[in-house]
Amino acid sequence: MIEKVLIANRGEIALRVMKTCKTLGIKTVAVYSDEDVNSLHVKTADESYYIGEAAPAKSYLNQEKILEVMLSSGTDAIHPGYGFLSENDDFARLCEKNKINFIGPSADSMNLCGDKMRCKAAMLKADVPTVPGSPGIVDDAQQAEKIANEIGDDLAAIIVEP
């Protein structure tokens, strides 16, 4: 059972996660930058920790600083919210390595889905229906035209990289 969640986000996103946690009886930990020191999510959380300057790269994207807060606060799970670290497979892997539950997809899933061609290949292998399209990267206009003719009326767009 998760007892304490660090929400690695701010504003309305953090507040929404906190509301759900409180409904479930889970303690919440907020992180904040210089810009958010007086924000509602900081005041609403059970615990709040300063993580750096206003620039996201120096605060909300600072994986080591957030890990430090997770470990020192006794957090057993992290909710990344939306944006920031929510799609960062390296951060999800860092959480796994430190035995902290990452509330979201696994690092491997994020890594796979970050590459459209690998993701589509995995979906096809698992018999998941996909939209019609190329089987891989389209190298030239002739190949694009051939694929477009095969797709027919379902064609939305094919982009040929130079």
Task: Briefly describe each language-model feature range.
Residues 1-148, 152-153:
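N-terminal beta-alpha lobe that positions the nucleotide/phosphoryl donor
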Residues 150, 154-162:
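Gly/Ser/Thr-rich active-site cleft segment
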